[in-house]
Structure formats: C-alpha cells, structure tokens
C-alpha cells in the first residue's frame, strides 16, 4: 500500500489524499467542489469523489464500464458543467461516450448526471480520465484508470500490480484556470497527489511515500495527468524495465530515466533489490515549475519495508540510460499500417502548426479551432455528410473508411514540445522526434506523441476502423483552449449505424442550452 505522511493541519478533511481503494467497473462518480492542499497551499478545486487525484478506476479486459457521472459543482469561479474523457479507450460503437465537449457531447449540467456506458473488449493497460471541457481538468478533475489483463504476457515477471503501484505525475496551480493568465506557469509538481512548492513562502509539505518489500518485483504504472509540464522521471538506485506504452505492450526495454509528456503512460517493472533504505523518486519538470530537487521539490520517496522513516540521502545516476522512443518496439502486431515506404498509405496529411502572437492563438493549417455550439457528432447524426457541412469550418477533416492515414506534424510552433493526442486510436510513430529516419517495421505504438523541437517532423500512421468524430489536439490544455486542435470525422456515412446514442445523451444539449451562461 502507499503510505502518505502528512500534517493533518494542511489537509482539509483528507481531500488531498488519493483514494487507495479503486472503484469500478460500475460506479457512481460524484464531481464536486472542495478545498485541497496537496502542497500545503489551500485552494478550491474540481474533484472526482472529493479527492485529488481522482480515485483509481479499475476493471478487467472485457468489462462493461458503467460510470454514472453526477455533477454537483457550485463554485462560480470555475466551470459548473463538466464532461469526462476516458483517455486511451477506442470507444468503438460508443463515440458518444468519448467525452470531449462539443465534439462528442454537450456538457453535463450541475444537478444533472450522465451514464458513460462503454465496453472494453480488446484493450488492457494503463489509461486515465479527465474533464474535457475547456481547461477544467487543470482545476483538479483528473485521475488514473487501469484495465487488468488476466492473460498479461508479462504476468510472471512481477509480483505486485495493484492500487499501490499506480504513480501519477501532475502539475498543480494555485490559481483557478479561469482566473489566471492564458498560459500560466504551474506552482508545484505532485506525485500521487503530494508535493512541495518551490516558491518563497511555501510551507514544507509532506511527500508521497511508495513502499516496497526487498526481493519483490513491482509493476509500476506511471501516468502523466499533467496539464502542461513534461517530466523526466527516475528512481535513485533502480532501473526501470519498460513493458507498456500508452496501453500497448512493448518489448522490454531497461532504462534509468524516461521523459513523459502530458497524457502519456508507461508501465515498468522495478525489482526491489537494493539495500533496505529510502530512495528519491524524481520527476523533474521541463517547463513551468521550479526545476531541480532542492528541499524535496519534484520528488517522492521509495521506502523499503524496515527502513527508517526519514527522507532519502541518495543521489541520481551520473550517466543514466535514457529512454528513446526509437528503441521501443511493440510486442505484437508491430508493423506500421500501409506499405513500408514513404507515401505508402491511402491518404497523407501534412499539417502546418503555428502560433499567432497578436491573437495568442494556435493554428493548424491556418485555422484556430473554436468549439462549435452543436457537437460534431450531433451534426453528423442530424444529416451532415461532408467536412464542408460540418462546423467549425476549416477544422473538420473527413477520413474515408478502411484506409491507412499518414499524418505529419512538423515542430516549431511556440511553446513546444507539443504532445499530440488522437482520440479513438493508437497510432504507429513511423518517425519519432529526434529522428530523421522512418521505421515501418516495428515503430512505437501509442496515443500521445511529443512532436519534438524545430527541425523534427514527427509522422504517425493509423487505420480508419472506428467511425465517428475523433479529436486530435495538443495535450497541453492551455494550448487546446487556444485552438490547437482539429476533428477527424471518420467514415461519416457509417457513424449513425455504428454509434446508436442513448436518450440521456440526446437530452444533454437541450438541458445545457437552457442554462444561464453563469451556470456553464
């Protein structure tokens, strides 16, 4: 079990501790406002079940998840409506349950509820969930989600894989999203919901403690629930044997540290084979937060059973083996779709990604994404049959069915590196950041990819086997709010027949549209 050391004076009703007991696959899910102080600084937040991060939702491969989201939000300084995105799930046949506001649904009104009811027949691994309405998840509505596989091919290589081996990394903001600047700097790195602020005047807050027993092997599931910051992650004195990337099994790859971007996940096996002691867990942010580890910032503690209850004195590896995406290879079905050559696809798209300084907006092919007032899915169900008929104009791309798509995402837009996420799919990264070569044989497969820095031209491939409108966007939430997104309307003619919508979904828009703007 995780052990959290804390001063009760800094905790309001225990709300900043992550719930240790997982919930699901069938559950009510209350979204509430409450005060939390994960770094000793108290603020009002938007919380799932009253805790940050939200509780672990868990189930098994093949489960039917029925998550009844109950909106009890009342704080007018933050959004009162909400939606939830279940990040990484294909939602085949349930596009209406994917969650992005005004793409797949209207928001849930305060005082109302909505049942997300979806099957997970062929996926397992590490996922997460978060609000997908404006920048609401930066105010706290985010948490981990795990689907266990009883036939996991790595099952015999670890002894422990449970609630206690999930590690969340978050950036934390002392100011509510709607009250701050468009591109705020985070105040604190939180590991499993606890951390220390690096600014002058911040209290010395307690750190998360992850307990291990010498001799045991642990499958840790590392989840970036970040709004912006990416993190360089390591555990002093221990190597990380990576076996899963964004809910896809990969060939084992042993490293000392890895960089994880907003929305990404890794599973790694850690063998507790060092002396019984305390070891620093490090998550150094790339942007927005005070970097380094002075005073225990950006840190947590790996504590062996029997070790003294003290902070570690360990040091980082001086020449670490660093994870490179180019070295990751899927365990099965490794080949990229299409022909193993440049242009060997049915449709190739090249996006021009830019930032417009005067407007403080991002653009894809010259267009800033502005959410429509009618969800894209509802537009399709109401008869729109081409991209030209769909709003927002210039931001919807129609994709044919049963086709292989290649998408190039050249870096260079201000504020990078930008992590891009495609809903409804995993994709093959045939050209990762930092590489000038293409790998069609066994490229990493994932659902969030960093597009790197100026000069990079990250290229991905996927098959259109999932009818519906699917969001593609930068997972830095401030950048999404500034228009860094498009919608892929996949196989428009089959959307309605493949994705029958429940009546409660149809009721969402009339209820939302009747709200006063102050209740949004």
UniProtKB/Swiss-Prot annotation:
Q: Does the keyword Signal apply?
A: yes
Positions contributing to Cu cation 4 binding? 418, 474, 479
Cofactor (UniProt): Cu cation
- Cellular location(s): Secreted
Would you list which residues are glycosylated? 75, 352, 402
**What would be one Pfam family of this protein?**
Cu-oxidase_2
Q: Does the keyword Oxidoreductase apply?
A: yes
Tell me how the cofactor is bound.
Binds 4 Cu cations per monomer.
| GO terms under cellular component | extracellular region
Name the residues that bind Cu cation 2.
Answer: 87, 130, 475
Instruction: Kindly list the GO molecular function terms attached to this UniProt entry.
Output: copper ion binding; hydroquinone:oxygen oxidoreductase activity
Could you say which residues bind Cu cation 3 here? 132, 423, 473
A GO BP annotation: lignin catabolic process
Q: Which residues form the Plastocyanin-like domain?
A: 22-148, 160-304, 373-496
Q: What class of enzyme is it?
A: oxidoreductase
**What InterPro entries does the record tag this protein with?**
Cu-oxidase-like_N, Cu-oxidase_2nd, Cu-oxidase_C, Cu-oxidase_fam, Cu_oxidase_CS, Cupredoxin
The signal peptide here is 1-21
Primary localization class, coarse: secreted
Q: What is its EC number?
A: 1.10.3.2
Q: Which cysteines are joined by disulfide bonds?
A: 106-509, 138-227
In this chain, Cu cation 1 is annotated as bound at 85, 421
Q: PANTHER family under this entry?
A: LACCASE (PTHR11709:SF511), MULTI-COPPER OXIDASE (PTHR11709)
User: What's this protein's family per the entry?
Assistant: Belongs to the multicopper oxidase family.
Q: What is the protein's known function?
A: Lignin degradation and detoxification of lignin-derived products.
What this protein is called in its record is Laccase
Instruction: State the organism of origin.
Output: Phlebia radiata
Gene designation: LAC
């Amino acid at each position: 079990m995780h052990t959290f050391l804390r001063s009760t004076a800094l905790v309001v009703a225990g709300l900043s501790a992550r719930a240790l007991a997982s919930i699901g696959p069938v559950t009510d899910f209350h979204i509430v406002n409450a005060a939390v102080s994960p770094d000793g600084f108290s603020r009002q937040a938007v919380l799932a079940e009253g805790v940050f991060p939200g509780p672990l939702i868990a189930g098994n491969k093949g489960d039917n998840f029925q998550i009844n989201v109950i909106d009890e939000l009342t704080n007018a300084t933050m959004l009162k409506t909400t939606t939830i995105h279940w990040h990484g799930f294909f939602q085949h046949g349930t596009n209406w349950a994917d969650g992005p506001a005004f793409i797949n649904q209207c928001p849930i009104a305060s005082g109302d509820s909505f049942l997300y009811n979806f099957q997970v027949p062929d996926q397992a691994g590490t996922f997460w969930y978060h609000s997908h309405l404006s920048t609401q998840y930066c105010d706290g509505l985010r948490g981990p989600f795990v689907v266990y596989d009883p036939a996991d091919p790595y099952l015999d290589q670890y002894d422990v894989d449970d609630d206690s081996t999930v590690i969340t990394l978050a950036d934390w903001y002392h100011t509510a999203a709607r009250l701050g600047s468009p591109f705020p700097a985070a105040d604190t790195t939180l590991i499993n919901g606890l951390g220390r602020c690096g600014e002058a005047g911040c209290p010395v807050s307690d750190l998360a403690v992850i307990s291990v027993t010498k001799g045991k092997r642990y499958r840790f599931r590392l989840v970036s629930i970040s709004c912006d910051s990416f993190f360089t992650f390591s555990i002093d004195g221990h190597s990380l044997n990576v076996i899963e990337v964004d809910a896809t099994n990969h060939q084992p790859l042993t490293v000392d540290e890895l960089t994880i971007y907003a929305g990404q996940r890794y599973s790694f096996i850690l063998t507790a084979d060092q002396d019984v002691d305390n070891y620093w867990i490090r998550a150094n942010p790339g942007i927005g937060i005070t970097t380094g580890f002075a005073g225990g910032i950006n840190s947590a503690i790996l504590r062996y059973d029997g070790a003294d209850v003290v902070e570690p004195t360990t040091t980082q590896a001086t020449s670490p083996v660093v994870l490179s995406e180019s070295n990751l290879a899927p365990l099965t079905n490794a080949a990229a779709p299409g022909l193993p050559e440049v242009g060997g696809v049915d449709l190739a798209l090249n996006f021009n990604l830019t930032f417009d300084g005067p407007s403080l907006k991002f653009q894809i092919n010259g267009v800033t994404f502005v959410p429509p007032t009618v969800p894209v899915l509802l537009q399709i169900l109401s008869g729109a049959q081409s991209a030209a008929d769909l709003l927002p104009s210039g931001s919807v791309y129609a994709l044919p069915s049963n086709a292989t798509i290649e998408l190039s995402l050249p870096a260079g837009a201000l504020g990078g590196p930008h992590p891009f996420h495609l809903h409804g799919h995993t994709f093959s990264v045939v050209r990762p950041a930092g590489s000038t070569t293409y790998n069609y044989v066994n490229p990493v497969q994932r659902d969030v990819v960093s597009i790197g820095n100026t000069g990079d031209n990250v290229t991905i491939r996927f098959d259109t086997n999932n009818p519906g409108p699917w969001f593609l966007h930068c997972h830095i939430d401030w950048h999404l709010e500034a228009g860094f997104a498009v919608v892929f309307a996949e196989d428009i003619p089959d959307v309605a027949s493949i994705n029958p919508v429940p009546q409660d979904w149809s009721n969402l828009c009339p209820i939302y549209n009747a709200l006063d703007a102050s209740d949004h």
